[in-house]
């Protein structure tokens, strides 16, 4: 910084100290200017908080948001274009219902109904994904631009005005000790900054209909989401009512106990051998797992490192490129093409 710059910073600091500590009064700006400044301040706070809350509205789970942020950052670093989507709660519940509905089979009324509801929830998750994309492009991104460009520029003008106001007031208090030319230049710069700040605030506030339009687009997107979701649920309700009606017309079966098959020793009065297999002692199915084909060294936080030949327990497939798993008590993510699946994850 030049000597003149250091001198100016000293003037500002000295004037600010006088106002805060000694109670010296600085130049007052007009009421209209102060009202605009207040509205700009409220607007800046509103935009910042709305951006945060809008993201929470679309993606309410902070843990998933953090995980997605990390995964998408890793994907970008590795040159992968496709981003991982947020796991919608409707889709997670739908997957669960589809899984157990298919396991119960087509001869189960409950199983068939679970499949119906699961498929409907998966459709709702797709509609929610569309809402996410739509709201981000038409509401969140424009608000972010407003914050990063227009409001940031106004803030710059206001800070510059305050700096020049302090410089002017410092020199004004020292009339006779400071050359009149310096005071005149300080007045000109102060008035120039005031006009710039005033014009930028005025133009912004006069055009706030743009923000109203963005709100209208947001409401339209939310309305479209709820309209499509309502249609899906109404169709699902009709399906379930039909299943209830059909199930009520099926004749009820009576329970008929089946006789126990007796062995030849049982027929002679000898009980079953104590060495016979006790029900329920079957070995449980193996956990989903995979074997490392190559060594994988984690480069980012949250990745799981392993050596060639390590057996890793699979817990989740994040996308077509990444698994989530556990090894020696540690959990993390690793690339699919580094492993060979031994026992696959359930569908």
Curated annotation (Swiss-Prot):
InterPro entries hit by this protein: AH/BAR_dom_sf (IPR027267), BAR_dom (IPR004148), Endophilin-A3_BAR (IPR032469), Endophilin_A_SH3 (IPR035824), Endophilin_SH3RF (IPR050384), SH3-like_dom_sf (IPR036028), SH3_domain (IPR001452)
Region annotation (Required for dimerization upon membrane association) ranges: 60-87
Predominant place of localization: cytoplasm
Positions of the BAR domain: 18-249
Listed Gene3D superfamilies: Arfaptin homology (AH) domain/BAR domain, SH3 Domains
Coiled-coil region: 180-201
Localization: Cytoplasm; Early endosome membrane
PROSITE patterns with a match to the protein in the record: BAR, SH3
One Gene Ontology term from the biological process aspect of the record: endocytosis
Membrane topology: Peripheral membrane protein
Ranges for region Membrane-binding amphipathic helix: 1-21
Spans annotated as Interaction with ARC: 218-254
Top-level division of the source organism's lineage: Eukaryota
Sorted UniProt keywords: Coiled coil, Cytoplasm, Endocytosis, Endosome, Lipid-binding, Membrane, SH3 domain
Comp. bias intervals (Polar residues): 261-281
Pfam hit, one: SH3_1
Residues covered by region (Disordered): 255-288
Residues annotated as domain SH3: 285-344
A GO MF term: lipid binding
Cellular component terms (Gene Ontology): cytoplasm; early endosome membrane
Role description: Implicated in endocytosis. May recruit other proteins to membranes with high curvature.
Complex formation: Interacts with ARC, DNM1, SGIP1, SYNJ1 and DYDC1. Interacts with FASLG. Interacts with ATXN2. Interacts with BIN2.
This protein's domain notes: An N-terminal amphipathic helix, the BAR domain and a second amphipathic helix inserted into helix 1 of the BAR domain (N-BAR domain) induce membrane curvature and bind curved membranes.
Family under the similarity heading: Belongs to the endophilin family.
The protein's name in its UniProt record: Endophilin-A3
